[in-house]
Amino acid sequence: MDENRSKALAAALSQIEKQFGKGSIMRLGASDVGKDVQVISTGSLGLDIALGVGGLPRGRIVEIYGPESSGKTTLTLQVIAEMQRMGGTAAFIDAEHALDSQYAQKLGVNVQDLLISQPDNGEQALEIADMLVRSGSIDVVVVDSVAALTPRAEIEGEMGEPQMGLHARLMSQALRKLTGNIKRSNTMVIFINQIRMKIGVMFGSPETTTGGNALKFYASVRLDIRRTGSIKKGEEVIGSETRVKVVKNKVAPPFRQAEFDILYGEGISREGEIIELGVQHKLIDKSGAWYAYKGDKIGQGKDNVREYLKEHRDIAMEIESKIRAAVGVSNPAEPAPVE
């Protein structure tokens, strides 16, 4: 670039920074753009690895969708619990009016510090989300769910009255407004979404998510969560086998999958994942029903090993660190010290 053009560019950059603030424009190579993505653990080791960066990215929009009772709310509550352990603050916008505080507490959520809002309509819910994001003091905002964000006009109208495209228009407008504020405040906003069936689809999947197409475009990460089976202890069902597919990922390669167990009343079984991934990466030796670590037997059967790792947290953490090192995914930030 010749000298005159360089001077003109420098003057323009200076004017932009003066008018819009420092950092409003920067050179990609000389900045931290795209480097060292700050993440929050999902509470699932396998999913952290599948996401490629060790968790869900901060300053981004995340969509988690799936059929009913597939573990969508459980996964988001685990993210909130992980954020709180790191000393962060979270807010839960409960548009479905269905959050169970006792269940959240069992998953490790500090319900005393969790901010909760149960809005009357979709506009109110998204306005509250925007105000929380703009405050810059919230780390995670969860909206549960997109399907329950009923536009005010629909609530005030007659039952059965056609309201074409109101929901999609509401989401599109809100996301245009939210996206810049989310990046500036480094807040992660998680939208939980439901599945609907498209009518008359001959080829391909008839499934679609609610709220139009805007969220699909604005989301940096989209997770498809499904229940694949039941976990039994004798005849009693104690949990569900779950598979999550990373359908979209702007911070790492997409289309990876993770499988884990969700135990009723406990949430994601971290110890179960450590066992499976430990065996996979040859850190834990499996011979018949027996499991051994560093030559020492740690239990017979997966349930007994899971209990052993719960009692010996230091060994569980050691194996987890080795798994993360083996796959090249760093540990999330250590929890903030308690005052």
Curated annotation (Swiss-Prot):
SUPFAM superfamilies: P-loop containing nucleoside triphosphate hydrolases, RecA protein, C-terminal domain. PROSITE patterns: RECA_1, RECA_2, RECA_3. It comes from the Bacteria. CDD domains: RecA (cd00983). Belongs to the RecA family. Can catalyze the hydrolysis of ATP in the presence of single-stranded DNA, the ATP-dependent uptake of single-stranded DNA by duplex DNA, and the ATP-dependent hybridization of homologous single-stranded DNAs. It interacts with LexA causing its activation and leading to its autocatalytic cleavage. This is Protein RecA. It comes from Nitrosospira multiformis (strain ATCC 25196 / NCIMB 11849 / C 71). The gene is recA.
